[in-house]
C-alpha cells in the first residue's frame, strides 16, 4: 500500500486540473463558491459513508474511522458541524450525492474515471490495489482464467470497470455477478462464510477484514495501486474542491495526515493466519472470564486494548512464566510487582490491576508534547524495553531530523537501538528495539481483531433481534 510520497504528485495534478477547469468553464463571479457557501450558510457539512473498517465504525458508542476522522476535521476547518449518513452500498452513496442529500462521499472510494462525467474528486489520501479474494482451503486461482465458481462485485464499483477491460483484452470467457444491495465488505464476508467463491476488493479493506475473518485469502492483484479519494458533485463543487485541496495540503504539511495513516493503516500488513485464528479462538474460549477484569482496571485506555496487551504478554494464561522470571497475565517482574503493591503475580486480578497501573504511570511520565492519542504507543514501547531506551529512541529520532513526538517517526528508530552504529550514540546503549517494535505492532493487530470481532457479534445479535 503506497503512502503520501506518491500522493503529493496526485494532489498537485488535481490542483492543476481544478485550476484549469475554473478558468475555462466558470465565469469569475461569486457563484463559484457554490456548495461551499451553502454548507457555511447551513452550518453543516453532510457526508455519506459506509459501515466499513476504514470509513466509519463505532467504538464504545463513539464514531471512528479514517474517513470519519478526516471529515470531522474538515468540518472543524470550515467552522460547521458534521452530519453523517451511513449507507450499506455504493448505489445508495451516489444517490445521496446526486439527490443533494450529501455534500461529500467520504467512504475510501477508489478513483473511477467513468464517474467523472457526473462527479468530481478530492485529493487522494492513500492508494490501494484491487485483489481477487477467495476462501482459504479452496484451490487458489493463478489468474482470472482459472476461476471455477461465482465471482461477484458491488454495483457501481471501480472493479467492474477493471473486469470489463480484462474481459475485452485477455479473458473473453470471464463472467461475474453484480450485487446492487451488498457492499464490498458484505461480499467479502460471504466469501469468508463459504457462500460466494470469489470477489474483488481493495488491499487495505482485505488486510483489515482478515483480522476478523482469517479464512479470507488473496489470490493475486488485478491492478496496480490506485488512489483513494472522496467524491463531490461536479455541477457545484468548485469552491468546495478548492477548500478540500487547501485542507488536505495543511494536513500533509503539519504531519496530521501521516499520524492518521499510521493510526488506521499502520498495522494492516503482517497478517499471520495461524496467529490470528488462535487469537480469535481465545476470544471465544478464554476472554469471557477475564473481560470483567480488563473493564474494571482499564481506566484511561480502552479495555480491549488492555486485553490485547495481556494476550501479547501471556496469551491470557494467569500462570505464564518466562525464562527471565516475569509472570502472570501481564508478565510483571518481581521488582515491578513490589513497586505496585502486587503480592501474587499469578493472581489474575492482581496482575491486571498491576499491569494497568504500571502502564498508566508510564503514560504520565511522557512529555505533554506527544499527542494524547499516540502516548499509548510510546508507553507500550517503554513497557516492553524500558522507559530509558524509549527516551533514546526519541533522541535518535530528533538527531536524524525526525519528529520525536510522532510515533510514525519514532517507531522506525526502535530497531536501530540494537545496531552498534546507532546505540553507541545513545545514552543508555543497546536495547532490543526490534522486539519492542514487534510488540507494539502485534498489540495493535490484536486490538483490531478484538474490536472487529465484537462489532460483528453485536451486528449478528441485532439481526437476530429483528
Curated annotation (Swiss-Prot):
Coiled-coil region: none
Keyword Cell wall biogenesis/degradation among record annotations: yes
Region of interest: Non-LT domain: 25-268
EC number: 4.2.2.n1
UniProt-recorded name of the protein: Membrane-bound lytic murein transglycosylase F
Family membership: In the N-terminal section; belongs to the bacterial solute-binding protein 3 family.
Phylogenetic lineage: Bacteria, Pseudomonadati, Pseudomonadota, Gammaproteobacteria, Enterobacterales
Gene3D superfamilies registered for this protein in UniProt: 1.10.530.10, Periplasmic binding protein-like II (3.40.190.10)
SMART domains per UniProt: PBPb (SM00062)
Gene Ontology molecular-function annotations: peptidoglycan lytic transglycosylase activity
Organism, as annotated: Sodalis glossinidius (strain morsitans)
Amino acid at each position: 500500500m503506497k503512502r503520501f510520497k506518491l500522493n503529493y504528485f496526485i494532489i498537485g495534478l488535481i490542483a492543476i486540473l481544478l485550476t484549469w477547469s475554473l478558468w475555462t468553464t466558470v465565469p469569475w463571479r461569486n457563484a463559484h463558491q457554490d456548495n461551499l457557501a451553502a454548507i457555511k450558510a447551513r452550518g453543516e457539512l453532510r457526508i455519506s459513508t459506509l459501515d466499513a473498517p476504514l470509513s466509519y465504525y463505532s467504538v464504545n458508542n463513539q464514531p471512528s474511522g479514517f474517513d470519519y476522522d478526516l471529515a470531522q476535521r474538515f468540518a472543524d476547518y470550515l467552522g460547521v458541524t458534521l452530519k453523517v449518513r451511513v449507507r450499506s452500498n455504493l448505489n445508495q452513496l451516489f444517490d445521496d450525492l446526486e439527490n443533494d442529500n450529501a455534500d461529500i462521499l467520504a467512504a475510501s472510494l477508489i478513483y473511477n474515471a467513468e464517474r467523472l462525467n457526473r462527479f468530481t474528486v478530492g485529493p487522494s489520501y492513500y492508494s490501494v490495489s484491487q485483489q481477487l479474494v477467495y476462501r482459504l482451503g479452496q484451490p487458489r486461482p493463478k489468474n482470472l482464467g482459472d476461476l471455477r465458481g461465482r465471482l461477484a462485485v458491488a454495483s457501481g464499483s471501480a472493479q467492474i470497470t477493471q473486469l470489463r477491460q480484462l474481459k475485452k483484452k485477455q479473458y473473453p470467457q470471464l463472467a461475474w455477478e453484480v450485487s446492487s444491495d451488498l457492499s464490498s465488505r458484505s461480499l467479502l464476508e460471504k466469501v469468508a462464510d463459504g457462500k460466494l467463491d470469489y470477489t474483488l476488493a481493495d488491499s487495505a479493506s482485505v488486510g483489515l477484514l482478515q483480522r476478523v475473518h482469517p479464512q479470507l485469502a488473496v489470490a493475486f492483484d488485478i491492478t496496480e495501486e490506485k488512489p483513494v479519494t472522496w467524491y463531490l458533485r461536479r455541477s457545484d463543487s468548485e469552491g468546495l474542491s478548492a477548500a478540500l485541496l487547501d485542507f488536505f495540503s495543511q494536513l500533509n504539511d503539519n504531519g496530521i495526515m501521516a499520524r492518521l495513516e499510521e493510526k488506521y493503516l499502520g498495522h494492516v500488513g503482517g497478517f499471520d493466519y495461524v496467529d490470528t485464528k488462535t487469537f480469535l479462538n481465545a476470544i471465544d474460549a478464554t476472554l469471557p472470564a477475564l473481560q470483567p477484569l480488563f473493564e474494571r482496571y482499564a481506566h484511561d485506555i480502552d479495555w480491549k486494548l488492555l486485553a490485547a496487551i495481556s494476550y501479547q504478554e501471556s496469551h491470557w494464561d494467569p500462570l505464564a512464566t518466562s525464562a527471565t522470571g516475569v509472570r502472570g497475565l501481564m508478565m510483571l517482574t518481581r521488582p515491578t510487582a513490589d513497586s505496585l503493591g502486587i503480592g501474587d503475580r499469578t493472581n489474575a486480578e492482581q496482575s491486571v490491576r498491576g499491569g494497568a497501573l504500571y502502564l498508566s504511570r508510564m503514560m504520565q511520565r511522557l512529555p505533554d508534547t506527544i499527542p494524547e492519542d499516540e502516548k499509548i504507543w510510546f508507553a507500550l514501547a517503554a513497557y516492553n524495553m524500558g522507559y530509558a531506551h524509549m527516551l533514546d529512541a526519541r533522541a535518535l529520532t530528533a538527531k536524524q531530523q525526525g519528529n520525536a513526538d510522532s510515533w510514525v517517526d519514532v517507531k522506525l528508530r526502535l530497531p536501530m537501538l540494537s545496531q552498534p552504529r546507532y546505540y553507541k550514540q545513545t545514552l543508555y546503549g543497546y536495547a532490543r528495539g526490534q522486539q519492542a517494535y514487534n510488540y507494539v505492532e502485534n498489540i495493535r493487530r490484536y486490538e483490531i481483531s478484538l474490536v472487529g470481532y465484537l462489532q460483528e457479534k453485536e451486528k449478528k445479535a441485532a439481526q437476530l433481534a429483528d
